[in-house]
Amino acid sequence: MPRKGPAPKRPVIIDPVYGSPLVTSLINKVLLNGKRSTAERIVYGAMEGLREKTGNDPIITLKRALENIKPTLEVKSRRVGGATYQVPIEVKPGRANTLALRWLVGYSRARREKTMTERLLNELLDASNGLGAAVKKREDTHKMAESNKAFAHYRW
């Protein structure tokens, strides 16, 4: 076990175009093989598409989409005796944000549209309307936690 304690949280650099740390986090999740300019082009293209399709600030739509994706409960495996139980636990706000962004980008990549910009744009639109695979993932996670509520007393 490490003796130095937990690593300090590093501050997220604010995005120069939209002035939002959320956009920076989204760019970092889209990033592959260190190609930041490509990731920025994808995210900024999706944000401009949001502005055109919704007619309002893309940051508001992004926040609404993330609120619809963020889980409040998840399950963690806990071994008791010879059995492993799926114990429901509450998700901390930072982890909820991270999971929401991870699911959003992951399910965007799995979509069928031609470019990643289109995939991200459509997944964001679906999520902001309460639809899409990322929102379904949140519902499945909550359902799993709900069905294992009997093991909540094993929480640590």
Swiss-Prot record:
GO terms for cellular component: small ribosomal subunit. Keywords: Ribonucleoprotein, Ribosomal protein, RNA-binding, rRNA-binding, tRNA-binding. The keyword rRNA processing does not apply. One of its GO terms (molecular function) is tRNA binding. One of its GO terms (biological process) is translation. The keyword Lipoprotein does not apply. InterPro entries: Ribosomal_uS7, Ribosomal_uS7_bac/org-type, Ribosomal_uS7_CS, Ribosomal_uS7_dom, Ribosomal_uS7_dom_sf. It holds the Pfam family Ribosomal_S7. NCBIfam families: rpsG_bact. Part of the 30S ribosomal subunit. Contacts proteins S9 and S11. Belongs to the universal ribosomal protein uS7 family. One of the primary rRNA binding proteins, it binds directly to 16S rRNA where it nucleates assembly of the head domain of the 30S subunit. Is located at the subunit interface close to the decoding center, probably blocks exit of the E-site tRNA. PANTHER family: RIBOSOMAL PROTEIN S7. This is Small ribosomal subunit protein uS7. It comes from Streptomyces avermitilis (strain ATCC 31267 / DSM 46492 / JCM 5070 / NBRC 14893 / NCIMB 12804 / NRRL 8165 / MA-4680).
